[in-house]
From Swiss-Prot:
Protein name, UniProt field: Tyrosine--tRNA ligase
Family as reported in the entry's similarity comment: Belongs to the class-I aminoacyl-tRNA synthetase family. TyrS type 1 subfamily.
EC number: 6.1.1.1
Top-tier EC class: ligase
Pfam family, one: SYY_C-terminal
Function statement: Catalyzes the attachment of tyrosine to tRNA(Tyr) in a two-step reaction: tyrosine is first activated by ATP to form Tyr-AMP and then transferred to the acceptor end of tRNA(Tyr).
Motif ('KMSKS' region): 231-235
Reactions listed under catalytic activity: tRNA(Tyr) + L-tyrosine + ATP = L-tyrosyl-tRNA(Tyr) + AMP + diphosphate + H(+)
Range of residues in the leader sequence: none
PANTHER family to which the protein is assigned, alphabetical: TYROSINE--TRNA LIGASE, MITOCHONDRIAL (PTHR11766:SF0), TYROSYL-TRNA SYNTHETASE (PTHR11766)
Membrane-spanning residues: none
Cell location: Cytoplasm
Cellular component annotations (GO), alphabetically ordered: cytosol; peptidoglycan-based cell wall; plasma membrane
């Protein structure tokens, strides 16, 4: 059964590059493999872009293989070279704190138990932190050709521009050594990562062969992009879509995926969920025949919110999504969920002494361009407050109208939402 994992990855479109697939399939068929993926703590949280390699680890575990999640406590202090510009170096204490936070996130995606498939968490600072400069140059650097390293696309682009520091230039060597250490310690024979990591992973494959005489494998998954070319995983505010609920609320997370374009949603379902081929075919047919129902998008958002934030948070944000658009009770929403939902819209602050009539609130919240436009919308029956229609342009909110004593939900028409927050 364990060898079938490559067939699943293939039909899901999850193989971007690999070492010889026949050899890899034969090893997977012989019995459980140990597989790893690494994640550098360059921020306090992982983000949506990390999900594909993380979930691929989980697929391997479900197929009977043992996953290792590697937190880059050492490599995170350097940073993988980017196409443009040097990374800012973070303080060691900051990286250590982020490493622990990310370690906790990594542990949500694979199962830890005493079985042969029980996951392992490692931190590469354990073996890299004590590595002396002489050991690094003799035992690792000696195996790398500068000519080959200079031929890497990212390095060539950096050298053609502002250049690259020796620190970032050496990142590849440290990541390659991780593969050596994980093979020594755990018999790891497969590293997976994003397609942009191919050069680093292959360097590790070669270093294992040169230092240990062992054959190991590499497999990369596609980088996620939207069909229109926009970058995947950016929230409505332009920042990353973080897994930490304090950095990206469960509501914002859910809304990002429920708004996935029809052109992307089936591909995302293949990559981000464990739905079967038959279930995906049904959702693809529903999208083609009844796109307005957005069944595939709602399933994608639900699956991923449960995965990252749990069932209770998912139920809360699904109710919030319905309630904001008039299909549920706003009063049942807890304040944290309501506030997070409204902050994904425009929120007008209502301070003591500020104009608080409905016309002023519509303009302040951006739902109407002018007072005249606001009055017209009210007379046409297109304005509601807390899901109750307002047809009087002189309407002023009373204290009892504020949800949790603080919030109003304004809606113009069926889809345009804004919030009002009472301050002071």
């Amino acid at each position: 059964m364990s060898g079938m994992i490559l067939d699943e990855l293939s039909w899901r479109g999850l193989i971007a590059q690999s070492t010889d697939l026949d050899t890899l399939a034969a090893e997977a068929q012989r019995g459980p493999m140990t597989v790893y993926a690494g994640f550098d703590p360059t921020a306090p949280s992982l983000h949506a872009g990390h999900l594909v390699p993380l979930l691929t680890l989980r697929r391997f575990q479900r197929a009977g293989h043992r996953p290792i999640v590697l937190a880059g406590g050492a490599t995170g202090m350097i940073g993988d070279p980017r196409d443009v510009g040097e990374r800012s170096l973070n303080e060691a204490d900051t990286v250590a704190e982020w490493t622990e936070r990310i370690r906790g996130q990594l542990e949500r995606f694979v199962d830890f138990d005493d079985s042969p498939m029980g996951a392992i968490v490692e931190n590469n600072l354990e073996w890299t932190g004590s590595l002396s400069a002489i050991e690094f140059l003799r035992d690792i650097g000696k195996h790398f050709s500068v000519n080959v390293m200079l031929a890497r696309d990212t390095i060539r682009r950096r050298l053609a521009g502002e250049g690259i520091s020796y620190t970032e230039f050496s990142y590849l060597l440290l990541q390659a050594n991780d593969y050596v250490e994980l093979h020594r310690r755990h018999g790891c024979t497969l590293q997976i990562g994003g397609a942009d990591q191919w050069g680093n992973i292959i360097a590790g494959v070669r270093l294992v062969r040169q230092k240990l005489g062992a054959t190991v494998h590499a497999l990369t998954v596609p980088l996620v992009t939207a069909a229109d070319g926009t970058k995947f995983g950016k929230s409505t505010g332009g920042g990353s879509l973080w897994l930490d609920p304090q950095m990206t609320s469960p509501y914002a997370w859910y809304q990002y995926f429920v708004n996935t374009a029809d052109a992307d949603v089936i591909r995302y379902l293949r990559w981000f969920t464990f739905l079967s081929a038959d279930e995906l075919a049904e959702l693809e047919q529903a999208t083609a025949q009844r796109p307005q129902q957005r069944a595939a998008q709602r399933r994608l958002a639900s699956e991923l919110t449960v995965l990252v934030h749990g069932e209770a948070a998912t139920a809360a944000v699904e109710h919030a999504s319905r309630a904001l658009f008039g299909r549920g009770e706003l009063a049942r929403l807890d304040e944290a969920t309501l506030a997070a939902a409204l902050r994904e819209t425009t929120v007008a602050e209502l301070k003591p002494g500020s104009p608080d009539g409905i016309v002023d609130l519509l303009v302040a919240s951006g739902l109407s361009a002018s007072k005249g436009a606001a009055r017209r919308t009210i007379h046409e029956g297109g304005v509601s407050v807390n899901n109750i229609r307002v047809d009087n342009e002189e309407w002023v909110p009373q204290s009892s109208d504020f949800l949790h004593g603080r919030w109003l939900v304004l809606r113009r028409g069926k889809r345009s939402i804004a919030g009002v927050e009472r301050i002071g």
